[in-house]
């Protein structure tokens, strides 16, 4: 490892954001260990070492954070039980989502604390990927949402158990900072999307699901199903921009929590139109019943601009173009 600048542990390295972070860290000269239940679905992991294991098992967490008897310089905690609206908002997976994700975070922090005590060091900086789902439902009833500020999180009332667990874990990470001096960074991700994200099977998020539905239509177009009236609004951030913002946060002295998102708000109907535009398909929308989530959610980026000098730069159309074409490649085998 002597030829590497730093060491990093990426938890959830088989997932969408984690696999992209592995690539970024390697490009910066890090030695990287990845850990996940599964290998990346769409490409080989580029991690120097990849451990397949279940982080809800404390013994796996304990082994994962140990870098040849020493602490990692940085840990990126993306591992969670999660999915899109069709997985999160039905209520059918609430117990698993809360139990599995909380167990992972409890195990990782306990393992880092114990390793610090054993080695008498405390150098590890840990990033935790929280979510815009922590924000209260009452602040997201307006589809013309002006943008959620970090201070809007309380009084707490997330609209899903996934959001409650994320909010609990934010507090968990900061409590380990206060009580044990573990350096933490927390970002609240707003709908990250892009190539190599899940695009079928029920856990995909809106951009991937809509790109797939439109790509499945003939060149002449057709009809796609949209949950609800399609007037619910969201903002979506392209994966490369998410990775850049996360790295800036880790390189800074600012702990967060901080929004990482786009301020370009669109309705789901408009998202369909953007996907249809890629191949100039004429697409009708068939509105059906389905899990919707909140009525309107958008990111307010004032804090991250102030603290990190970061802002999103890719228009939604550009990210959808790249994602649509990648999904079409997957469909064509």
What is each PLM-predicted segment?
Residues 8-28:
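N-terminal Rossmann NAD(P)H-binding glycine-rich loop of SDR-like oxidoreductase domains
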Residues 55-101:
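NAD(P)H-binding glycine-rich loop region in Rossmannoid oxidoreductase-like domains
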Residues 106-159:
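Conserved Rossmann-fold NAD(P)-dependent oxidoreductase catalytic core, especially the SDR/UDP-sugar
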